[in-house]
């Protein structure tokens, strides 16, 4: 029998599908990535084609093995991590989606959310699901699809339609429709799941009129869910044995499995999570209470703050504003000036996430004077990512009562040394950048490997968490507070912009 030497992590993100092969020492052997189309039918609406998600993800799996020149029978297990909240409804018989995937960033369900608020459900939802009422989460998206695709609610009741987040969709496709599951971390993002009883919440299903028949079974983040054939029928059968939403996977990949440990991921958005152990801390400061993974993939809780626009604001500088040619340019131009010349950019293109939760905020640039040039705006856009992170960290420390001593960071933007240094400056906290940047994939690989005994426990993995560089604060407290006060003022003015004046 061939020795099982590798784990594959599938990392299905918002803009691309990736596959990563890792060996027993958690070294990355090969990576394959394919981008797919972002669909914007109306302002504020965002969709993906679920078949394209599947096509890009399945082709990266084949590609990554070919690139590494390894055969599928050397793979011990597959772990899956995914963009969370994105919602897919498909036909059980044919496997065909009845509508495009409604993406986490999509704001089309703002009105449904207003109704939930008017019906006085905020406290119930916060207490039982850990979430705030916002279009971000899957529940209102499922309702929207069932409301708008004729006959779909009746079909769902008859058991003809299935709902899933992206992890569920991928596993369903990989197992030829044999397995309809999700894990606790993804379920905790739907607004349909009770994070205390660890079951689907009857009241939420009733309120949103979502038939229970269409929901997946919820399982631990580290166990064998089913097998997939690589290379079609008769190919090698490989266990799929790890699932976690991207942010929880990154938390696990950073080995933040003890209470009080935190990480910030700088991707399309920014996501900060702090592990709170076995205690679900209810936030009084606009954060989410969510499910994370303990040392063996069991249920832990975490506080989470989501910033919607991080890397996406750099893409805006590149694609819409044409101020830079690629993301790497942003650091070069930002360091061409000493400061932002009084400019603040509030990148609230799709509203504001934690701790404000204002779907009606819109992007704005404040403090423009005649001397402001493109470099100042580029620098201010980068700084906005760090300011938003501080907003979240302040809320997190207030809720948890824990003063953070170091923030572990990951995601594409951490390669930007200017941003990481400014992040440390504005937080007044050490920022630790790990050597392995692929921590989301790492988390999925760890969860999958632990389930099949590829690794015995997390102690084996501790020495792999090498910090490549540590950034320390380099500005005075008064300067830090002065700059942050300017940011708060700018945010205040960008809020409620889209609300029509009565």
Swiss-Prot record:
Ligase as UniProt keyword: no
GO CC annotations on file: cytosol
Activity-regulation annotation: Activity of this regulatory enzyme is affected by several metabolites. Allosterically and non-competitively inhibited by fructose 1,6-bisphosphate (FBP) and unphosphorylated phosphocarrier protein EIIA-Glc (III-Glc), an integral component of the bacterial phosphotransferase (PTS) system.
Positions annotated to bind ADP: 14, 18, 268, 311, 412, 416
Catalytic activity: glycerol + ATP = sn-glycerol 3-phosphate + ADP + H(+)
Listed Pfam families: FGGY_C, FGGY_N
Keywords: Allosteric enzyme, ATP-binding, Glycerol metabolism, Kinase, Metal-binding, Nucleotide-binding, Transferase, Zinc
Pathway(s) served: Polyol metabolism; glycerol degradation via glycerol kinase pathway; sn-glycerol 3-phosphate from glycerol: step 1/1
Binding site for sn-glycerol 3-phosphate: 14, 84-85, 136, 246
List of residues binding ATP: 14-16, 268, 311, 315, 412
Gene Ontology molecular function, alphabetical: ATP binding; glycerol kinase activity; metal ion binding
Binding positions for glycerol per the UniProt entry: 84-85, 136, 246-247
EC number: 2.7.1.30
UniProt function note: Key enzyme in the regulation of glycerol uptake and metabolism. Catalyzes the phosphorylation of glycerol to yield sn-glycerol 3-phosphate.
Descriptive protein name: Glycerol kinase
């Amino acid at each position: 029998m061939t020795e099982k030497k590798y784990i594959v992590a599938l990392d299905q993100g918002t803009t691309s599908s990736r596959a990563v092969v890792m060996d027993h020492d958690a070294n990355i052997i090969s990576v394959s990535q394919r981008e797919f189309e972002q669909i914007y039918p109306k302002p504020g609406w965002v969709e993906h084609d679920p078949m394209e998600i599947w096509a890009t993800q399945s082709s990266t799996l084949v590609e990554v093995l070919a690139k590494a020149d390894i055969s599928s029978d050397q793979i011990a297990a597959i772990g899956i991590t995914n963009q969370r909240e994105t919602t897919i409804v498909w036909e059980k018989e044919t496997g065909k989606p009845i509508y495009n995937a409604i993406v986490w960033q999509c704001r089309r369900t703002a009105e449904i959310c207003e109704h939930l608020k008017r019906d006085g459900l905020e406290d119930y939802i916060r207490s039982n699901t850990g979430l705030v009422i916002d279009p971000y989460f899957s529940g209102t998206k499922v309702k929207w699809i069932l409301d708008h695709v004729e006959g779909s609610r009746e079909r769902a009741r008859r058991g003809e339609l299935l709902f899933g987040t992206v992890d569920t969709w991928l596993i369903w496709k990989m197992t030829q429709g044999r397995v309809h599951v999700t894990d606790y971390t993804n379920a905790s993002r739907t607004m349909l799941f009770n994070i205390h009883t660890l079951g689907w919440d009857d009241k939420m299903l009733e309120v949103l009129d979502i038939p229970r028949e269409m929901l997946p079974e919820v399982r631990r983040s580290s166990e064998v869910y089913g097998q997939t054939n690589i290379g079609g029928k008769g190919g090698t059968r490989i266990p799929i044995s790890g699932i976690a939403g991207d942010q929880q996977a990154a938390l696990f990949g950073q080995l933040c499995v003890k209470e009080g440990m935190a990480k910030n991921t700088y991707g399309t958005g920014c996501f900060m999570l702090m592990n709170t152990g076995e205690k679900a801390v209810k936030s009084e400061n606009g954060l989410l209470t969510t499910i994370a993974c303990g040392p063996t993939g069991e249920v832990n809780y975490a506080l989470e703050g989501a910033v919607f626009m991080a890397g996406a604001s750099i893409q805006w500088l590149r694609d819409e504003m044409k101020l830079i040619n690629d993301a790497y340019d942003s650091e070069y131009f930002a360091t061409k000036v000493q400061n932002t010349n009084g400019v603040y950019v509030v990148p609230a293109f799709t509203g504001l996430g934690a701790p404000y939760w204002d779907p009606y905020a819109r992007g704005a640039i404040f403090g423009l004077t005649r001397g402001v040039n493109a470099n100042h705006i580029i620098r201010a856009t980068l700084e906005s990512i760090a300011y938003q992170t501080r907003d979240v960290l302040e809320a997190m420390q207030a809720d948890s009562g824990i003063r953070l001593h170091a923030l572990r960071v990951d995601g594409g933007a951490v390669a930007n040394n200017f941003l990481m240094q400014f992040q440390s400056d504005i937080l007044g906290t050490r920022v630790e950048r790990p050597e392995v940047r692929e921590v989301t994939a790492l988390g999925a690989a760890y969860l999958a490997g632990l389930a099949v005994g590829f690794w015995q426990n997390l102690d084996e993995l501790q020495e792999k968490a090498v910090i490549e560089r540590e950034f320390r604060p380099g500005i005075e407290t008064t300067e830090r507070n002065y700059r942050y006060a300017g940011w708060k003022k700018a945010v205040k003015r960008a809020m409620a912009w889209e609300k029509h004046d009565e």
